[in-house]
Every structure is written in structure tokens, then in C-alpha cells.
């Protein structure tokens, strides 16, 4: 393993690692109670395992996911990538960076979480983002290269102090209505992992990793594939350590029920409160300020990277509209949504992610299968169509818009995993039907 592989591995870690990756495992630890381990392991599966798999699978074709998706259907490739870029961009991920920064800085320091304070903060925040994105230079890279090690060192220090301060406490009782068995803990952790959005982000990040490996002089697809796996494992190990550690500490922080009620009444995010509690307990007032500033800078650089990526993609598919117009438009959309507050942004993302994630997981696995088993286009199209339809119908039923009894009776519906057995059966059916269809097998381009 050479130096470049380590650098690429930690670069991938930096791309995946954001404030949301701190909030969700910590809150999961608190809420899971005695069913912490099945919950956190399932969370790691969707929050780390799937993103790792997503990056690796993207290296199977020299054109990345654009090439792989085009082999399924050019129309699917265009529509699904647009949905993914909007999801990890202006609709959810970018607004979340602003609202998270607000809750990690202004709320704990000024004890003010009002709408006016949020509005003023997001105006300043997105003006900085606008300036950096309209004038992209090495400033963002320099901030990122300095910030990531500093953020990692700070979090590790906080984790060590957290184990000292809270590790001896007994596990809290958690949310017994949602976490009442090992299986329910697993299913809750699995779906909570959706909120990191890293699995769908891996589809966008994969090409960045592949190009970075190519710049080191490696050109053969098999060697690129191997280096991608190693780099992905480096990032995954770092994320596993942080997720489990933060979750474990969150599981052993005893928050009075009155405090939880007060947080819910103020619509303040519990995860950010737990992190601030850890920092303050460990390092006093200094820890609260330091964590707030570092997380805000991490969110800022993440927002800039996402705005640039999304704007460049849309400029590529709609070249008549200038890049800067997309930048301004997506920042305005992000600004409006960020002012709904962190909890509102998270709540809005849940229904959308419940549809996107099953499709994303299915397509990643189908591409991986096609790498080893001769596969025709229709064998991938059938399960994707069925999973997409089932996910939409399940969302409609879950939200109570229309009650569909068939959806309620599906296996694993209670655990929000009803799409998985359907995906397995649909894949088997797709491959059987493909034997009777005259199509050439999918071949991923290596050179």
C-alpha cells in the first residue's frame, strides 16, 4: 500500500464525513437503549457498508455510474442522477449543512434558536458559500486539507474524554416504543442510516475517487478496482470507529425526560444537544466553542463542494444555462429550505430517502452481480421498476395518503424492509425472463 492510497482513502473519508455523521449515531445511541448494538451495526451497514460498496461498484466501468446506468437505460441514467444530485444538493444535504451549523454554534452559545437568528445566520452563511462557489480557487482545498485532520483530532479527543466522562454510566432506556427487540433495533438502525445520504452520495463520489487513482499513474481497470477497495476500507475503518464510539457514548448519556421534552418543544435537534453536552463536559466552555466553529467550517466546505458539483452536473446536461446561474439558483433554494430548521429538513428528507434508497441499493447490487454473471439489460430493468413502484406505494401507505392493504401485508413491512424480499424475487424473475429475450450481455468498459 503506497502513500497515495492512504491520501485517497482519507480524502474519501473527508468527503463522507460531515456534521450529520456526528449527529445521527449519537442520537441513535440515546434512543436505542438496551438494543444499541443491533441498531448501531445496522446503522453502520447503511451508513458505511453501502457507501463503500457504492464507491467500489462505481469503479467497474471506466465511465463510472454514468456508463453503468446508461447500459440499463439512458433515460434512467439521466432521471436517477438528477434525483440524486438534487437530493445530496439543494433539497436536503446543503440546507442541512446550514441548519446544523446554526444549531452547533448560535443555539448553544447564544441560547437563541429563533427564526430571526436562523435567518440572519443563513444569510451570512450562504453569502460566503456564494462567494467561494462563484470564485472557486485553492482556498476551499486548503481549508479542507487543514480542517479534516483538525476535525478528526478534535472528535477523537472528544470521544476519548467522552468515554472517561460517560463510559461508566449505565445504558439508558431509550425509546421503548421504537426499540423493543433486537430485530426492531436493527431495522431502526438500518433506516436511520439512510439519513447520512452517504450511499447515494457514493454514486457521485465514486468518479472522483477513480480519477484520483488514475492521476497516480494506475490505468488498468482491475488495478483501479483494487485500489478503490483499499481506499474505501481506509475510509470505512475511520467511520466505523467514530460511529460506534459516538453511539456508545450517546447510549450512556442520561438526559432527564424534562430536558428531552424541552428540546422537542423548542424543535431543537437532540443529536446536536448531545454533542454539545459531550464537548462542554469534556473541555468546558472552550469545547463548546471549538466544536461549533469546526463543525461550521466543515459544513461550509461541504456545502461549497456540493454546490459546485451539482451546478457543474446541471451545466453539463443543460449547457445553455451558465454555471453561475445554477450556483445562484441552488443557493437560493438551499437558503429557503435551511430556514425551516434542522429537524424540519431531516423530516422532509425521510419520505424521499425511503423511496430513493431501496432503488439505489438495488441498482448498486445489480451492477455488482452483472460483473460476475452474464446479464442482459432487461434483467436489471425489471427489478428496478418493481422496487421503485413498491417503494412509492409503500410511501403512500406509510404517509396515510391511501391505504393499500397489500402493502401492509408484505413481509418485513413492520421494519420498513419490505422492499428487500421483493427486490430478490424481482431479480430472479428478471434473470429468468432475460433467457427468452434477445439482447446482448452487458459489458462494462475497462479501457
Swiss-Prot record:
Role description: Component of the transport system for branched-chain amino acids (leucine, isoleucine and valine), which is coupled to a proton motive force.
GO cellular component, one term: plasma membrane
Gene Ontology molecular function: L-isoleucine transmembrane transporter activity; L-leucine transmembrane transporter activity; L-valine transmembrane transporter activity
Entry-linked Gene3D superfamilies: Amino acid/polyamine transporter I (1.20.1740.10)
InterPro entries (UniProt xref): Brnchd-chn_aa_trnsp_Livcs
Pfam annotation, one family: Branch_AA_trans
Compartments reported by the entry: Cell membrane
Name recorded for this polypeptide: Putative branched-chain amino acid carrier protein SERP0977
GO aspect biological process, one term: isoleucine transport
Annotated keywords: Amino-acid transport, Cell membrane, Membrane, Transmembrane, Transmembrane helix, Transport
Phylogenetic placement of the source organism: Bacteria, Bacillati, Bacillota, Bacilli, Bacillales
Coiled coil regions in record: none
Family: Belongs to the branched chain amino acid transporter family.
Entry membrane topology: Multi-pass membrane protein
Transmembrane segments: 5-25, 40-60, 74-94, 114-134, 143-163, 193-213, 229-249, 290-310, 317-337, 350-370, 382-402, 417-437
